[in-house]
């Protein structure tokens, strides 16, 4: 059996060589050891799944865009081909999302004792149910969107005991606001969430420890960018 230390090292090798499927396998073995993950291990498992799922999310978006173009041209034969191909990508996405969500609920959350760890993995649960909602429809979409909302809400309640400038709390607010904007089509709620997180953090900016200053300010910038984009979109809609 490979030691935890070696699995973490192999995971880093896989990351550096952009072999993310293998990175996932190494970090899954670490998670299944049944003890709380360190900050480094937490970030490694997050990066591994983000890349494995992210590449397929990007593929799905490209294919969906091409499908719309062919539909507009009236190319029914091509549309059928694209639909079959899109279904293949959706099946892969479903498998990957199911895989990460199982690891989160069965191991990562159960073994989390620190507030940071609990918020990190509850946010991650919200993220993967959100990704699920991007490519599903009807009842399935409603089911995963509800689960995403519940996970984000629980993470937000727990994160209240972290300082407003904490990168995990800020990252959660960023993703939760994106959930409202993209999945719930609720621009008002998205803006309210992003603005609150940004305003609370800016008041405490002078208290941010040096080691997390860069991370905190980067996420704050992303919150502000989204706010600018969303408010201008809302203006256009009016």
Curated annotation (Swiss-Prot):
Stored Pfam families: 14-3-3 (PF00244)
Any one Gene Ontology BP term: protein localization
InterPro entries hit by this protein: 14-3-3, 14-3-3_CS, 14-3-3_dom_sf, 14-3-3_domain
Coiled-coil residue spans: none
A GO term from the CC aspect: cytoplasm
SUPFAM superfamilies: 14-3-3 protein
Gene3D superfamilies documented for this protein: 14-3-3 domain
Family in the record: Belongs to the 14-3-3 family.
Job description of the protein: Probable adapter protein.
Matches recorded under PANTHER family: 14-3-3 PROTEIN
Protein name, per record: 14-3-3 protein 2
Organism of this sequence: Entamoeba histolytica (strain ATCC 30459 / HM-1:IMSS / ABRM)
């Amino acid at each position: 059996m490979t030691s935890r230390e070696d699995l973490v090292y192999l995971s880093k090798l896989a990351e550096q060589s952009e072999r993310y499927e293998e990175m996932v396998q190494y970090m899954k073995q670490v998670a299944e050891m049944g003890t709380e993950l360190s900050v480094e291990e937490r970030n490694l498992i997050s990066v591994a799944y983000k890349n494995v799922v992210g590449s397929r999310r990007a593929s799905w978006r490209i294919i969906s865009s091409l499908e719309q173009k062919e539909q507009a041209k009236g190319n029914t034969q091509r549309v059928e081909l694209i639909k079959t191909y899109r279904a293949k990508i959706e099946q892969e996405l479903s498998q990957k999302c199911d895989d990460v969500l199982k690891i989160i609920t069965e191991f990562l959350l159960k073994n989390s004792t620190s507030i940071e760890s609990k918020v990190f993995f509850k946010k991650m649960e919200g993220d993967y149910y959100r990704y699920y909602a991007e490519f599903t429809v009807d009842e399935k979409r409603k089911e995963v969107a509800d689960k995403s909302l519940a996970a984000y809400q629980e993470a937000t309640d727990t994160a209240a005991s972290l300082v407003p400038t904490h990168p995990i709390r800020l990252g959660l607010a960023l993703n939760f606001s994106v959930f409202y904007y993209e999945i719930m089509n609720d621009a008002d709620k998205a803006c309210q969430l992003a603005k609150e997180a940004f305003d609370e953090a800016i008041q405490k900016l002078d208290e941010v420890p040096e080691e997390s200053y860069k991370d905190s300010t980067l996420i704050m910038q992303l919150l502000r960018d989204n706010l600018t984009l969303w408010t201008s979109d809302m203006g256009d809609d009016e």
